[in-house]
C-alpha cells in the first residue's frame, strides 16, 4: 500500500513539474527586455570609472588647498568643512562589475581590465581612507551578503593597496611582454593620438607608469610612519622603484601626465566665458599660492593672475601679484579686492577660452618632487637637486612658459580689452636665486621641495596640496575667522551619517579605536600621528 502511494505521488508530480518548467521559461522570455543588453562591455564600464579619477577645479578642494578664495558671500565663503566626507564606494562597485564582465569575455582573470582593477581599487581606497581613517575594506562590497562590514585599520588599507599596486605592475608587465594588450575604454591614453595604436600596447605601457608613479605618491604620504611600520617596508619599496626603472617604469616627461583634457565643444574647463560675469570679480587667487609665486619672482604668477593695480606697481612687477589670505574675514577680502589690492584670476588664461589647461590627476612634476623628497629623506640614493629642478621645469612646460621671452596678457585697467607684455624669464636665473637654489639634503632643502610641489599642485590633483600640508606643515596655511572651525584647519572629515545608522556597531568601534569615541574633524588619524 505504501509503495502505491509513493508511485502515485511521483506520477502526479511529473506533469506539475513540467507545467512549472514551462511557465518559468515563458516568464523569463516575456520578462526580458530585449532592448537592453544582458552584458556590458568592460570597456564601457572602464570609461565611467576613469571619469571618477578627476577632481575638477573650482570646488571646495581648491579652497581647502588654499589656491582660491571667494570675496563675495553670495558665491560662498572660505570656511573649511565641518561635516562628513563623500566616500565613493560606487566607483569600486563598478570596478568589480568591470572585472566580472572582462572575465566573461576573456574566460580568465588574466586580462588588462583586471590589472587596471588592482590599480583602481588601490586608488579609491586610499582616496577614502585619507579623508576619514579606518574603513570597511576586506568585508565591503558584498551587498546583502554582508550589510554590516567590519572596519579595516588605515594601516591595513595602505598595506593592501600597496600589494594591489605591485600586482598591477606585475600583470601589466606580463601583458606588455607577451602581447596580450587588447582593451578599450581608456580615454586618457589609448584614445589620444600620442598613444593610440591598434593593439593598446602603448596605452598599457603608460598605465604601468601610472601604477608605479602613483605608488611613489602613496609611499611618500606614509612618511610619518616610515620608521614604525616595519611590515609596510616603506623605505625599501620606495628604493626598489627608484632603483629599477626597467621593472618599475615611472613618468619621465609631461607626455606621461595622467590628466583630464578639456575641449570647447562639450567638456569645458570650469572657469570659462560662460561664467565670467558671475565669477570674475568675486574670486581671487589665494595668498598661499600667489604671494609665494610673487616672492619667488615666478612667472607663473603672471599666467594665473591679474596684477593688483591698486598697489600702484607696474603690471609686470612681481610685487603686483598678491593673493587673498583665506584666514581673513570675507568683508576684509571684499574690501581688498574692490580696492585692487589682491589679485583676481587672469582673464586671458581662465576666461578667454573654454579649455584653460588640463586638470592633472598625477603628473611628472609630482613624481620628480616625490623622488627628490625620498632622496632628501635618505630612502634611496640619487641627485635630489636634479629631480627638484626637473619638477620645476616640468611645471613651466605645463603652462607653456619658455626659457627666454614670454608673452603675458592682462585685462586692461578699464575692464575691456587686453594688454600684452613681453617678459624675459631665464630658467637659470630663477633656479639660482638663493630662495630657490636647492640647499641640500637637509630640512631647508626638504622645505624647498615641498614648496615647489605645492605650487605644482595649483588647481589640480584634488586634495593633495592639503594632504601635504597636513603631513608636513608646508607651506604655512592662512588661518583665522575666514577659515572657520575656531581658526583651526580640520585634519579629517567625519564619517558619512549613513555609517552610524546602517553599520552602527562597527562604526562606533572604529571611532572608539581611533578617536576616543569622538568623530571629530580636528583629531589626527594614524597616517599623520
Question: Where are each of the predicted segments found?
Answer:
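Short, hydrophobic/amphipathic alpha-helical patches that form generic packing surfaces
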Residues: 44-55, 120, 373, 450-458
